[in-house]
């Protein structure tokens, strides 16, 4: 089994959830660029991490060449030889082109770019219902993953909070930005003939089954 996948979709589409489930089924690693960046800036002796941390602390966007270098480093690790599921990258056409070149140099190519389509109102409903425990960081959803007691963490019994990012006005803004920024990447993969669209509202099991069909596997 080999597959080189990119997951695209708005915030709240469930990309990370689907990628983790597919990793469990296939053994192909879920590579979250958000996780990579959080890890790299914590490393005191990593020059690349120091550069990125300085840029982020200034509130600036990390340039493509540094993002590409971080991703290249991770994809060059042994566990990615049979494939990967990229979540959070590429965000620009330049990054998509870099990924193509990186794979081409290894005589590989992207299997598919999977676009999880979720309407704005569903994203708003999902994300505004998200709550987090301020003590342990556990994430809940008042609709799909509620705590046992009303708005209290199951573990800490502390009142759950809503992140600023998950307030309706912010969620709608993030969705708009996603459409503007990601459309060129969607168009890029569409022109290459490897864009696969999946309805992100049909439930986790059905979504996973659709992705397994796309890569030519069946969930047995």
UniProtKB/Swiss-Prot annotation:
Record InterPro entries: Adenyl_kin_sub, Adenylat/UMP-CMP_kin, Adenylat_kinase_CS, Adenylate_kinase_lid-dom, P-loop_NTPase
Catalytic activity: AMP + ATP = 2 ADP
Binding residues for AMP: 33, 38, 60-62, 88-91, 95, 163, 174
GO MF, one annotated term: ATP binding
A biological process from GO: AMP salvage
PROSITE patterns: ADENYLATE_KINASE
Primary enzyme class: transferase
EC number: 2.7.4.3
Role played: Catalyzes the reversible transfer of the terminal phosphate group between ATP and AMP. Plays an important role in cellular energy homeostasis and in adenine nucleotide metabolism.
UniProt note: domains: Consists of three domains, a large central CORE domain and two small peripheral domains, NMPbind and LID, which undergo movements during catalysis. The LID domain closes over the site of phosphoryl transfer upon ATP binding. Assembling and dissambling the active center during each catalytic cycle provides an effective means to prevent ATP hydrolysis. Some bacteria have evolved a zinc-coordinating structure that stabilizes the LID domain.
Listed name of the protein: Adenylate kinase
């Amino acid at each position: 089994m080999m597959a080189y996948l990119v997951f695209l979709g708005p915030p709240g589409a469930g990309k990370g959830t689907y990628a983790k489930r597919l990793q469990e089924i296939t053994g192909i690693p879920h590579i979250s660029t958000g996780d990579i960046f959080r890890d790299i800036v914590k490393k005191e002796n990593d020059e690349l991490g120091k550069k990125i941390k300085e840029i982020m602390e200034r509130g600036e966007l990390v340039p493509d060449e540094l993002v590409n270098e971080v991703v290249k480093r991770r994809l060059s690790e042994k566990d990615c030889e049979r494939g990967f599921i990229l979540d959070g990258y590429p965000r620009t056409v330049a990054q998509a082109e870099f990924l193509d070149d990186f794979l081409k140099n290894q005589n590989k190519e992207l299997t598919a770019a999977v676009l999880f389509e979720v309407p704005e109102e569903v994203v708003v409903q999902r994300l505004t219902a998200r709550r987090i425990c301020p003590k342990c960081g556990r994430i809940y959803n008042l609709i799909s993953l509620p705590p046992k007691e009303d708005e209290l963490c199951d573990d800490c019994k502390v009142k759950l909070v809503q992140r600023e990012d998950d307030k309706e006005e912010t969620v709608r803004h993030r969705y708009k930005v996603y459409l503007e920024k990601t459309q060129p990447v969607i168009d890029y993969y569409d022109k290459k003939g490897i864009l696969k669209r999946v309805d992100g509202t049909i439930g986790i099991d059905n979504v996973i089954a659709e992705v397994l069909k796309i890569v030519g596997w069946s969930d047995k």
